[in-house]
């Protein structure tokens, strides 16, 4: 996926989870943050961030914050991007070679899972999770407790137990990650649910991405350490 009209700016602060203040061309701008997660380890005063200029002339703010530099690493933090890049990749045959249909927002049980992918032989239910937390070259999820994430894992487990191909798919919005693991220190219940689901047939996959200020593309599979 690609962004249009991307500019670099300096992060100042984040008064709430929806907006940030940045310095652009010597002026302070208020910009929506396309990720309502905590992201405290990323949005550090003085860091460089990437902004995409909006296309709606009537909007109150001109830019959206989409990425941040953490040292020498560029991290895409757009919460909408993982589903978009997965859909592009799956449509191009990256996930499965014999796809006949891709249905987003698929109702299953008591949840809506991100995708139902149909092949000639079976249905594949996929829940996508974007990962932005990096420590020493390894990625962790989640960066904050997510009861919704636990619920999705349990729905996937029920699907796997009925014979469907159920997949939890981590899109790591960072390049050159060595591994992905559940963040047990932040949300032990998520890690416990994930390990139980994997033991009952849920496939847990992770791929990192090629990340530039104006693009994000699924790159290669990386190990998941449960």
Q: What label would you give each PLM region?
A:
Residues 16-21:
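Short aromatic-glycine-enriched beta-strand elements
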Residues 13, 53-58:
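Short, charged beta-turn/beta-strand-edge "cap" motif at the junction between a beta-strand
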Residues 173-226:
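Domain-level recognition of nuclease-like catalytic cores that cleave nucleotide substrates
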Residues 37-50:
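Short nucleic-acid-contacting surface segments enriched for D/E, G, S/T with interspersed K/R
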Residues 56-73, 218-219:
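OB-fold/S1-family single-stranded nucleic acid-binding modules
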């Amino acid at each position: 996926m690609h962004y249009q009209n991307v500019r670099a700016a300096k992060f100042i602060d984040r008064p709430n989870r929806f907006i940030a203040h940045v310095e652009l061309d010597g002026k302070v701008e208020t910009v929506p943050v396309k990720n309502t997660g905590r992201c405290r380890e990323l949005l550090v005063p003085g860091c460089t961030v990437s902004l995409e200029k909006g296309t709606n002339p009537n909007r109150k703010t001109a830019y959206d914050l989409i990425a941040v530099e953490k040292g020498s690493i560029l991290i895409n933090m757009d919460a909408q991007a993982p589903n978009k890049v997965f859909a592009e990749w799956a449509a191009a045959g990256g996930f499965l070679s014999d796809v006949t249909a891709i249905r987003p927002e698929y109702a299953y049980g008591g949840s809506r899972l991100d995708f139902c992918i149909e092949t000639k032989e079976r249905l594949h239910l996929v829940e996508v999770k974007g990962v932005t937390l990096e420590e020493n070259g390894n990625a962790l999820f989640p960066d904050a407790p997510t009861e919704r994430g636990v619920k999705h894992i349990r729905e996937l487990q029920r699907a796997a137990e009925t014979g469907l191909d159920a997949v939890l798919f981590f899109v790591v919005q960072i390049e050159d990650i060595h591994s992905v693991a559940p963040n047990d220190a932040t949300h032990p219940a998520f890690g416990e649910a994930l390990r139980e689901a994997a033991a009952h047939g849920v496939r847990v996959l992770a791929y990192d991405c090629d990340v530039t200020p104006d693009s994000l593309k699924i790159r290669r599979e990386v190990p998941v350490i449960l």
